[in-house]
Amino acid sequence: MATVLLASDLGTLRRELRDMLEGPDLLIEEATNGRDVLKRVREGGVDLVVADLQIGSMGAMAICLELRHEESYGACDPVAVMMLLDRRADVFLARRSTADGFVVKPLEPLKVRQAVRALLRGESYEDETWRPTTVRVGATNAE
């Protein structure tokens, strides 16, 4: 059974994620701030952190960067991190933070479950909805 730590200061978002992911193969835990995420990961046994980009004083980017730093000198076991992005422009932040994956809000249950499964298999996951779409207008294409 894999342990997934949901990190958000919004109870509604944590409940929404729990409803999407809860099942017999996942143990779901919750944290309301970045410090609690770091503390729980240091204790060990967390396979995936799903973190909201905007969490009080320590959001997903800071959490991810700190975890990568601590992993580098053995303070915690390596853990996959999935960021929940507020808008398409946040993809740059997700990539800079070395997150293993990201999903852009609004959250779609199927997409979130696919991302979590991929990350738990050791793969990366990028939500494709951030990419610009090409729209055909008459005889020309517009982006």
Summary of predicted features, one role per range:
Residues 107-117:
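C-terminal output helix
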Residues 32-48, 52:
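Acidic, metal-coordinating helix/loop segments flanking the phosphotransfer/catalytic sites
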Residues 49, 102-103:
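Two-component signal transduction core modules
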Residues 47-70:
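Conserved phosphotransfer microenvironments
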Residues 8-32, 36:
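Two-component/phosphorelay signaling modules centered on CheY-like receiver
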Residues 47, 72-80:
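His-Asp phosphorelay/catalytic-motif detector in bacterial-type signaling
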Residues 123-143:
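CheY-like receiver
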Residues 62, 83-101:
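Alpha4 helix (beta4-alpha4-beta5 surface) of REC/receiver domains from two-component response regulators
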